[in-house]
């Protein structure tokens, strides 16, 4: 897609190893800069691709003299059990990589882990991934809310992920206009009068679907028990009203905050919305 659109050759240098941890792609110095990171615990992992700095030494250092436009990153499952430091680790890694490529603002685009059963920590990992958008300047995300498969760890439609990476790069790195870089990102949630108003950003033409039910929303009251909620678009804006008959006095709203879910909220270009929650509770099924 980049070749066809830009009319110039575009190459990709691939450094990858399935099931790797983010720590393996980082230098010892970058790892030590992350407060709370436990080296002994990381070194105890049995899988070679999860050992600290191993893939950094073998697959990043040998290529850091090549010039490049930016980075594409698709990883996360290898850190699903220690997700709490993921955003900090990724921020430190990107800072280090940009230093080595001598470009402090080098674009860094990453894919969200897709839905799929297997580990209850996945929604928390995804939350950390989305948090990186605010922590890493000039970063972007490929949302994969619609690409999962119930009993698979990874998205089976890898070609669609690649196309969305291309769309993101064309919009952000190459400044092309006329299409959004990604799906709807959460701007804010206001809960009042028994309902929630959910507002999205970077969605100038509004949300979809407009003609049938929007799925994936849940609400909870003081008992912290979540129930499916109904959502409707407000006047063709990037705004939703979310309500739930079973929860007359809601205090929390979630969207797609499970390991496995099926949702249908997108922008008018068909790019899916991000998962989110307004609470900080640990109850996830």
Predicted regions and their residues:
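Cell-envelope and extracellular/periplasmic
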Residues: 1-285
């Amino acid at each position: 897609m980049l070749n066809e659109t830009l009319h110039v050759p575009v190459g990709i240098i691939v450094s990858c190893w399935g099931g790797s941890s983010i720590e393996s792609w980082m230098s010892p110095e970058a790892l030590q800069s992350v407060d709370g990171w436990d080296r002994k615990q990381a070194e105890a992992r049995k899988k070679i691709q999860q050992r600290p700095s191993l893939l950094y030494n073998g697959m990043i250092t040998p290529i850091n003299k090549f010039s490049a436009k930016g980075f594409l990153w698709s990883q996360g499952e290898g850190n699903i059990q220690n997700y709490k430091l993921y955003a900090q680790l990724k921020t430190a890694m990107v800072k280090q990589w940009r230093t080595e490529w001598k470009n402090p603002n080098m674009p860094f685009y990453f894919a969200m882990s897709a839905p799929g059963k297997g580990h209850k920590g996945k929604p928390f990992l995804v939350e950390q991934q989305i948090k990186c958008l605010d922590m890493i300047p000039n970063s972007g995300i490929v949302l994969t809310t619609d690409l999962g498969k119930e009993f698979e760890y990874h998205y089976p439609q890898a070609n669609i992920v690649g196309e969305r990476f291309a769309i993101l790069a064309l919009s952000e790195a190459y400044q092309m206009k006329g299409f959004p870089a990604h799906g709807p990102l959460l701007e804010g949630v206001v809960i009042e009068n028994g309902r929630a108003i959910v507002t999205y950003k970077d969605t100038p033409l509004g949300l979809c679907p407009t003609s049938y039910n929007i799925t994936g929303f849940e609400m909870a009251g003081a008992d912290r028990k979540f129930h499916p909620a109904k959502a409707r678009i407000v006047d063709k804006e990037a705004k939703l009203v979310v309500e739930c008959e079973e929860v007359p006095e809601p205090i929390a709203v979630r969207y797609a905050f499970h390991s496995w879910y099926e949702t249908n909220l997108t922008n008018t270009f068909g790019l899916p919305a991000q998962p989110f929650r307004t609470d900080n509770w640990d109850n996830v099924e």
